Amino acid sequence: MTVSGKAGGRSSVKGPGPLLSSVIVATVAVVIAFILYLYAIILTGSLVKVWGVNNEITLENYSYVFTHGSKAIKDTLLIACIGTPLGGLLAVLVGYATARLKVRGSRILETVSLLNYTLPGTVVGIAYIIAFNDKPIMLTGTIYILVAAYLFRYSSAGIRNVIAALSQIDPSIEEASRSLGASSVKTFTSITIPLVLPAILAGMRYLFIHSMTAISATIFLVSVHWTLITTRILECMTELQFAQACAFSIVLIVLVFIASGVINLLARALCRSGDAIGVH
């Protein structure tokens, strides 16, 4: 028996009436306009000399960002690029152990992996400082504590995505592969991974974006050796350098949009490759 997912009869559920549709459209339009207004304010602020005092158009703020803030940009991208693939790997391992292996304690592993995200960022930052500020594992002031904080805090979305994707895949597909002589590793890499790849990439994108934009835990973990764009924005705001803070924000927004676009293109390319392999 094949379940196509198509309705077998005419649906009796009616859509919203004209009045309700107009209200929904108007509400969405107001929200979108407000978001675009905020982006426009930040962009405008990044192009003036002194916000509210000297509104002469200038690019000096961006020159400041790429001269005095180049290290923060490099560090932010490096940490995000290191943590993102590790987050994808962690999501696959925890998700597969929970949804497929069902080993003893797998639910506890899932709960613990999600618990880190439910805690406030300030609590997480302080906890990492206390936990890794002394031997045998001393990570304070290094890149490793930042990567670990982002990895274990923001990989929860990827874990949930993988678990949800695996729960929708019939285990008999993998059993059929193994019954035809494929090893467990071959089945995992050739069958399971391609099927849950969109969920993995969605989780990786979530982790990358939050690694770029996180601030609550970050302010406790940065050091003179490692600084991030978000902390530079905070520094500019505390020093009343609003134009420079806006310029840093625009650079961060552009980087996040570029990263999201690249991951989307990668997802489409990999999905097409998977479809081509399936056809052949």
Regions from the PLM with identified roles:
Residues 1-15, 96-98, 105, 163-174, ...:
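C-terminal transmembrane helix and the adjacent membrane-cytosol boundary/short C-terminal tail
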Residues 37-40, 44-47, 89-93, 126, ...:
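Membrane-embedded alpha-helices of multi-pass transport/permease systems
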Residues 1-75, 140-143, 266-280:
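N-terminal, non-cleaved signal-anchor transmembrane helix
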Residues 67-98:
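Transmembrane alpha-helix signature in integral membrane proteins
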Residues 17-25, 93-128, 278-280:
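Cytoplasmic-entry segments and transmembrane alpha-helices of multi-pass inner-membrane transporters
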Residues 6-16, 48-52, 56-59, 67, ...:
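Membrane-interfacial helix termini and adjacent extracytoplasmic/periplasmic loops
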Residues 1, 15-20, 46-71, 212-264:
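Interhelical loop and adjacent transmembrane-helix boundary motif
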Residues 25-36, 115, 152, 159-162, ...:
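Transmembrane alpha-helices
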